A protein has these predicted regions:
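A conserved hydrophobic helix/loop-capping motif in glycosyltransferases and polysaccharide synthases
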Residues: 3-11, 220-229, 236
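Short N-terminal helix/helix-N-cap motif within the alpha/beta-hydrolase-1
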Residues: 103-104, 231-234
């Protein structure tokens, strides 16, 4: 079974319902999102982030919401790196709870992982314009990935992607020596562009603002966060 780490906001727990139903054929590990309030409570985001390098990369200062978003994804990498059930060359799926996946997306994700197993990260979603005619996966499609000439094209969206355990371990080791300085979707800032694949046929999309207002019946019984966010932030500061 594919292991899927899903990031959810505790105040929007009901949004997970649809995703969990769609991912019933995988092993789902809920990860409670770091919030901008938790970051701002520390009073000094430099305790969690390398602001100087981030400003050089972004040409501006990242805000607390962006820092929290990045730390939420790093929390998933840490969980993957520590998962003894996964082999180093196994992929795990990272998803943001509000993603709207296509039908049978878990099986399609497995197919992408099998076909592009030499890549460390396989992006299954994309934000913004699609320069290479990327579109949602349809029943007759085969897994097909793109290699962009303009490597910045990899840095649009991080709501759904596969990451190999050895990459998660490498990133976790890096973060024990340095604080993060990238945003969650700036993949080329923390991983080699030539080792990233972008799905041409996307396995999910983010809801429009109108769709976000729609609330489904929550499945509270299976939302069990495995990580204590406060302790995780303390570890980030200590590292």
């Amino acid at each position: 079974k594919l292991t899927c780490y899903v990031i959810y906001a505790s105040e929007r727990i009901e949004r997970l319902s649809h995703f969990l139903q769609c991912a019933s054929d995988s092993h789902v590990v809920p990860i409670s999102a770091v919030t901008k309030e938790q970051v701002s409570l520390l009073g000094h985001s430099s305790a969690l982030f390398n602001l100087k390098r981030a400003e050089e990369l972004l040409e501006r200062t990242p805000n607390d919401k962006e820092i929290a978003h990045t730390l939420s994804h790093i929390q998933c990498w840490k969980a993957i790196a520590e998962n003894e059930q996964l082999q180093n060359n196994d992929f795990a799926l990272i998803a943001e709870g509000e993603i709207q996946p296509v039908e049978n997306f878990i099986q399609h994700a497995i197919n992408y992982a099998n076909k592009y197993s030499s890549y460390g990260i396989i992006k299954l979603q994309r934000d913004g314009k699609t320069p290479a005619c990327e579109r949602l996966y349809q029943a007759s499609d085969e897994p097909d990935a793109l290699i962009y000439g303009d490597t910045n094209q990899y840095n649009y969206g991080c709501s759904l992607y596969l990451i190999r355990k050895d990459v998660a371990k490498k990133l976790t080791a890096l973060l024990s020596e340095t604080k993060p300085y990238w945003l969650a979707d700036q993949f080329t800032a923390f991983h080699e562009p030539q080792n990233i694949a972008q799905a041409r046929y996307l396995l999910g999309e983010n809801p429009s603002p109108k769709q976000q207002d729609k609330v489904e019946n929550p499945l509270f019984s299976i939302i069990v966060p495995i990580y204590n966010v406060e302790r995780y932030l303390e570890q980030c500061i200590e590292s």
